[in-house]
């Protein structure tokens, strides 16, 4: 048959084998997919898959829990579909691939929702009860959407960080790391959000541009004798006029808390004589800064930063209020730069990490640190001049007072990247507060008399033992761990797991039986949830000591919640499903894979690594996979304000979840994932091509029974053996990609296979044999044998990403056979072995190149009007060498490969030549097969049939060997 498209023929006295299938051409995905979801739920498909893999090696993809707040967005869909594809691909490879979905349930966003719905000031217990109910409802909504995407997992038994057992085990994990010596309490600057009223984790901070007042402030000379010595000048010369050391800052609100100044020990500093007085600036900044100050000046002396160490200066507000009558010493700091500003940094230890470290290193006690900013961002009422003002409102007033003091040299608006709360989108600050920390560089308790590496050392070593997909994630996580500060474990919140400590009222010391008491609290939490801590009377546990202690009111960082799920879930609540003793014995890393967005290098990947390093001394995972963020077709970040967000629910309802899955699978997740209406239209077209190929395969297998019609590969036609060999080669590539968590190459190769290898060649050639040879002929059954094997292999390749379609096709393909009732309990298909497969592949590759040249020449003749269909043509090919031999080996079957009515081969003048001559056939057209043949009408009883069709219908049937 030709490649012409024909309407379904009316009944003919010369019928062809045109079969139909119950697999429809139109996917009608929005309607059919929910039916599949319900069917999978009803038959408990995930349980059936687990039962089918019982005893097999486990593969654990541990779910990074989404937050139980709001509807899922396209980023959630990407994440869950990627996980689902991996779990299904591993399951089809024969592994017991386990997927327990989870949810992150505690934290500020839910507290905010409760506050919005019920107002502020609720008792803690009431907040917790309402938060638990709210999270439960959100989880139900999100679960429906995740299942709608075709994601299989233990949806009936997900893990929730708010489950009582998980909350209790989290407390036990805290107890363990305390016993190991990682946890301490201290005053440190931490990320602080005024709107949250709490410390923030590093992962809860984002950076946005902010406009601030940039100021250059002079600290008046106080110890001129020491300055004179440093600059090798006389005291009289320095006392002749006023002088200042000048700092530059973009946080005027920190000036009232200044306690020191920092210079770089190796930088050269200049004493500059100006009409206003002496200024001390970094030498390389003098020219630029004088321009800014609109001053002329001359350098009269220079010295090194080291020579200025410990020299003190007056606070710039000292003249305005005696409350600032203090001196600020110079401390040396390697972090001081001369890229911008004056080369001198003002230090407010309560509001800067480096400031704090520098001042502490020089002997400043916690008690001495000045910290007037309260948790709501307002200065304490006792602060001179600015008490009661918010720090942002105080900025312009501070500038006014500095100007009045005569110590302001410049002020202007300055745009810079600044820290913001990821929830409230409001600016945050560093603020020194008393918090509980996990120390990155503290020395843990010795084990068996041996020193234990620090947390930082253990975590960095763990990174080296972890596989990263893509590989750049390794360096990214390494840099974050190498440079991070101590982990602030405590939060000042209500809806969170309590740091259930008893603290001495006078000394602040922990109760000496803290580890034992934590276990007692954990048992109560296991029965009643974190609410048990709120209702607990200290006397119940402390007896007569109760009056000496108070309950700690801090909660654990929510990143500790999700970061300990390797302990609370894999080794805890879902141990029966997820725990693998052999993996524990091997190296203790129980999760084969953690998979999340690239932001989780500073989030879940990070916190999980730190907690596992403290608990076990190794990472909880063997591999980390990172995917990019979704952007629109122009590469812009998804934003409601821009109006470019895409709803997975809308796509599923309009196009089908299968389109989302195919889009995810076909996109390189290692970078940004672009999505738009235009991109989705292309995905739909791609889906249709794959579906049409499947429909053709299933249609032509509708009268095939493998138990009756199977033939050994040696009895197939040569082109059938080639097609199966090609399928086998592709399958090896597909499975290799799946092993490496690569999906877009699989989709690309499947599309090429469908459009070029099958639709553009093999199936195109096969149509004549399938349609025109006798229904039960060996030639036709051989073709169906090949299609049977190709279809079964292809359905398994598709199943991880086109899950609904593969399952739908499987029901048609496997109906009434001994196959499993779902494709997901089967495994990748083992294709029959084809003898001399490599030789066949090479030979047919050459033949396809010849066919491409013939098609090109046929098209040229068609354009000229000499022929219509390619079957109106007869072709002569002149070739040499192996190509000539390959063409000649096909004998009369060559015309079927070329889709022409006749084909002859002759030697070319030169061995490497390939010459194609096309002529229009002068013969009559067979009514049935449409070939133009000399023997049409040779049987007067059937004057419109060629001899081949006459034989196939009424005689012994034609014989074919090759195609």
UniProtKB/Swiss-Prot annotation:
One of its GO terms (biological process) is isoleucyl-tRNA aminoacylation. A motif ('KMSKS' region) lies at residues 637-641. Its EC number is 6.1.1.5. GO terms for cellular component: cytosol. Its cofactor is Zn(2+). InterPro entries: aa-tRNA-synth_I_CS, aa-tRNA-synth_Ia, Anticodon_Ile_BEm, Ile-tRNA-ligase, Ile-tRNA-ligase_type1, Ile-tRNA_ligase, M/V/L/I-tRNA-synth_anticd-bd, Rossmann-like_a/b/a_fold. Zn(2+) binds at residues 926, 929, 946, 949. Keywords: Aminoacyl-tRNA synthetase, ATP-binding, Cytoplasm, Ligase, Metal-binding, Nucleotide-binding, Protein biosynthesis, Zinc. It catalyses: tRNA(Ile) + L-isoleucine + ATP = L-isoleucyl-tRNA(Ile) + AMP + diphosphate. GO terms for molecular function: aminoacyl-tRNA deacylase activity; ATP binding; isoleucine-tRNA ligase activity; tRNA binding; zinc ion binding. L-isoleucyl-5'-AMP binds at residue 596. SUPFAM superfamilies: Anticodon-binding domain of a subclass of class I aminoacyl-tRNA synthetases, Nucleotidylyl transferase, ValRS/IleRS/LeuRS editing domain. Binds 1 zinc ion per subunit. It is found in: Cytoplasm. Its main location: cytoplasm. ATP binds at residue 640. PROSITE patterns: AA_TRNA_LIGASE_I (PS00178). A motif ('HIGH' region) lies at residues 66-76. Catalyzes the attachment of isoleucine to tRNA(Ile). As IleRS can inadvertently accommodate and process structurally similar amino acids such as valine, to avoid such errors it has two additional distinct tRNA(Ile)-dependent editing activities. One activity is designated as 'pretransfer' editing and involves the hydrolysis of activated Val-AMP. The other activity is designated 'posttransfer' editing and involves deacylation of mischarged Val-tRNA(Ile). Belongs to the class-I aminoacyl-tRNA synthetase family. IleS type 1 subfamily. Monomer. IleRS has two distinct active sites: one for aminoacylation and one for editing. The misactivated valine is translocated from the active site to the editing site, which sterically excludes the correctly activated isoleucine. The single editing site contains two valyl binding pockets, one specific for each substrate (Val-AMP or Val-tRNA(Ile)). This is Isoleucine--tRNA ligase.
């Amino acid at each position: 048959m030709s490649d012409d498209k024909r309407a379904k023929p009316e009944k003919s006295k010369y019928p062809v084998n045109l079969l139909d299938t119950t697999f429809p051409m139109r996917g009608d995905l929005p309607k059919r997919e929910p039916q599949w979801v319900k069917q999978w739920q009803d038959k408990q498909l995930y349980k059936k898959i687990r039962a089918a893999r019982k005893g097999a090696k486990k593969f654990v993809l541990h779910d990074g829990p989404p937050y139980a707040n709001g509807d899922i967005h396209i980023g959630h869909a990407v994440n869950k579909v990627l996980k689902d594809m991996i779990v299904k691909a591993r399951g089809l490879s024969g592994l017991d691939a386990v997927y327990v979905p989870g949810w992150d349930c505690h934290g500020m966003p839910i507290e905010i929702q409760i506050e919005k719905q019920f107002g502020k000031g609720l008792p803690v217990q009431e907040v917790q009860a309402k938060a638990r109910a709210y999270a439960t409802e959100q989880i139900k909504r999100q679960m429906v959407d995740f299942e709608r995407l075709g994601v299989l997992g233990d949806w009936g038994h997900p893990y929730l960080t708010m489950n009582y057992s998980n909350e209790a085990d989290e407390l036990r994990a805290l107890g363990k790391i305390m016993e190991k010596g990682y946890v301490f309490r201290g005053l440190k600057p931490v990320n602080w959000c005024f709107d949250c009223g709490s410390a923030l984790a590093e992962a809860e901070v984002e950076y946005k541009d902010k406009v601030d007042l940039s100021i250059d402030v002079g600290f008046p000379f106080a110890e001129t004798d020491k300055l004179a010595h440093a600059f090798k000048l006389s005291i009289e010369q320095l006392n002749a006029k006023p002088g200042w050391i000048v700092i530059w800052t973009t946080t005027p609100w920190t000036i009232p808390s200044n306690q020191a100044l920092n210079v770089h020990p190796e930088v050269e500093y200049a004493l500059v004589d100006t009409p206003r007085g002496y200024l001390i600036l970094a030498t390389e900044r003098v020219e630029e800064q004088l321009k800014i100050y609109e001053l002329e000046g001359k350098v009269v002396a220079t010295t090194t930063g080291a020579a200025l160490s410990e020299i003190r200066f007056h606070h710039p507000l000292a003249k305005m209020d005696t409350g600032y009558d203090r001196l600020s010493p110079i401390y040396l700091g390697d972090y001081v730069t001369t890229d911008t500003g004056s080369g001198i940094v003002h230090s407010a230890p309560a509001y800067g990490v480096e400031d704090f470290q520098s001042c502490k290193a020089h002997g400043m006690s916690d008690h001495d640190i000045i910290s007037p900013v309260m948790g709501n961002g307002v200065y304490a009422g006792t602060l001179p001049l600015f008490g009661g003002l918010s720090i942002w409102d105080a900025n312009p007033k501070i500038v006014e007072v500095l100007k009045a003091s005569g110590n302001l040299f410049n002020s202007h608006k300055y745009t810079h990247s600044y820290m913001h709360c990821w929830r409230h989108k409001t600016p945050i600050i560093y603020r020194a507060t008393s918090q509980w920390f996990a120390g990155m560089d503290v020395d843990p308790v010795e084990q068996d008399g041996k020193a234990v590496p620090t947390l930082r050392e253990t975590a960095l070593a763990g990174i080296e033992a972890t596989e990263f997909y893509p590989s750049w994630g390794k360096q990214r996580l390494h840099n974050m761990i190498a440079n991070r500060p101590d982990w602030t474990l405590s939060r000042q919140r209500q809806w969170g797991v309590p740091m259930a400590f008893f603290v001495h009222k006078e000394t602040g010391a922990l109760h000496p039986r803290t580890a034992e008491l934590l276990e007692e609290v954990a048992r109560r939490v296991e029965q009643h949830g974190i609410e048990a801590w709120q209702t607990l009377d200290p006397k119940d546990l402390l007896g007569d000591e109760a009056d000496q202690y108070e309950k700690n009111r801090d909660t654990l960082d929510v990143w500790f919640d999700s970061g300990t799920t390797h302990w609370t879930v894999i080794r805890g609540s879902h141990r029966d499903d997820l725990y693998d003793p052999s993996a524990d014995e091997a190296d203790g890393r129980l999760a084969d894979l953690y998979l999340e967005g690239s932001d989780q290098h500073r989030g879940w990947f990070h916190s999980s690594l730190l907690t596992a390093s403290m608990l076990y001394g190794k990472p909880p995972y063997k591999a980390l996979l990172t995917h990019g963020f979704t952007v629109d077709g122009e590469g812009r970040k998804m934003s409601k304000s821009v109006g470019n967000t895409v709803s997975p629910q809308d796509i599923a309802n309009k196009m089908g979840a299968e389109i989302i899955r195919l889009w995810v699978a076909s996109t390189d997740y290692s970078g940004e994932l672009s999505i738009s209406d235009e991109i989705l239209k292309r995905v739909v077209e791609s889906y249709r091509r794959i579906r049409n190929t499947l429909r053709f395969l299933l249609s032509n297998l509708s009268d095939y029974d493998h138990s009756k019609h199977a033939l050994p590969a040696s009895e197939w036609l040569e082109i059938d053996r080639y097609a199966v060999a090609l399928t086998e080669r592709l399958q090896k590539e597909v499975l290799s990609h799946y092993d490496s968590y690569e999906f877009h190459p699989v989709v690309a190769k499947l599309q090429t296979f469908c459009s070029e290898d099958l639709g553009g060649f093999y199936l195109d050639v096969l149509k004549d044999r399938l349609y025109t040879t006798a229904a039960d002929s060996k030639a036709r059954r051989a073709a169906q044998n090949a299609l049977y094997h190709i279809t079964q292999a292809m359905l398994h390749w598709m199943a991880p990403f086109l899950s609904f379609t593969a399952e739908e096709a499987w029901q048609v393909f496997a109906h009434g056979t001994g196959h499993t009732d779902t494709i997901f309990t089967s495994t990748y298909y083992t294709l029959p072995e084809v003898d001399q497969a490599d030789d066949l592949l090479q030979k047919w590759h050459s033949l396809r190149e010849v066919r491409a040249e013939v098609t090109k020449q046929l098209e040229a003749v068609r354009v000229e009007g000499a022929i219509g269909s390619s079957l109106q043509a007869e072709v002569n090919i002149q070739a040499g060498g192996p190509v000539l031999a390959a063409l000649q080996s096909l004998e009369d079957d060559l015309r079927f490969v070329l889709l022409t009515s006749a084909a002859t081969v002759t030697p070319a003048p030169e061995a490497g030549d390939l010459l194609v001559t096309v002529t229009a056939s002068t013969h009559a057209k067979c009514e049935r097969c449409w070939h133009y043949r000399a023997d049409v009408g040779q049987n007067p009883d059937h004057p419109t049939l060629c001899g081949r069709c006459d034989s196939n219908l009424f005689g012994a049937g034609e014989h074919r060997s090759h195609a």
